[in-house]
Amino acid sequence: MRQQLDALCAGSFMVDIVATHLPNITPPGGLIYAPNGISINIGGHAANVSIDLAQLGQKSVTAAGCIGNDMLGGYIQRTLKISGVEPSPQILDEIPTAKNISLTVEGEDRRFIAELAANTLLSPDHIINLLKKQPRIFFLGTIGGLKYVDKTLPLILQSARDCHTTTLVDVIPPIEPNWDHLTQALSFIDIIHLNRNEAYLITGISDPKKAVIALRSLGANTIVITSASKGLTALRGETMINMPAFKVNEVDSTGAGDALCAGLIHSLLTLKNPNKFTLDEFQYALLEGQAAGAACVTSSGATTNVKTENIRLLLNEQGDTVLSLSTKSITNID
């Protein structure tokens, strides 16, 4: 009997080219050397979440994204496979694999130079064909930045529902400042994750406690809004959960949201049915997600520290405290 796929992660694939601790950005014609070298890393939401899941012990994870038929596309496939993930890319001959350049001057925030390339062109049909493998959970990231997927979200999510697959969708601010692609699909999404700024852009409400209610009124089911070091606010049914963050020394926040999604998915995959969880099981999944996000930011790189031992250490040292400071309340939703 063929083993059921635990998780399908779809969204963006890209290659990050990173130089940190630069003394300055040179004027035109200048040259500087990167004191810590220049690194090349796999990136993109689908890649990050799938690698995180493999590092947390999931053995049956597939990642889907769009790449070019080029050297960097091959690098992405090899890196996924080495990490324990089955790559299922859509490969284009005429469009290059996407690249993102990250430059950090000592004492300043990161500067990014990105391109819109193959990563934006993932086909809905490619995803729907992979959903025929009936994954237990389907993570769909980069919504707002996938040209064709954004236009057909309800169709893709209904295909997942037809396969009895639980869906978790993660969003980014859209290339065009219009959220219709998401709001029209909210009722098809089992769990939606977004950060506080994204929630504000959709609802016009800065308070996460009010924003989750606004999202529910737009049709969302289970909602998770994260606020970095301020923790998260979630709404499941009529119950709102507010949970503080774990306390860690932040080194690099890259991939923190992806890590949270991976931790949440990993916890739900321990259940018989990932979509029929009790409130306590959901709260623990949020706790594990926050621990994964906290572990992520303690080192450079989007997936470097998202490992079982680091998350277990955080849960053992701070988990009870975070839970004790969390609140659950019944919310009146008109």
Regions found by a protein language model. Name each.
Residues 91-92, 102-147:
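Conserved phosphate-binding/catalytic loop of the ribokinase/pfkB sugar-kinase fold
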Residues 2, 131-133, 186:
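A short, aliphatic-rich alpha-helical micro-motif
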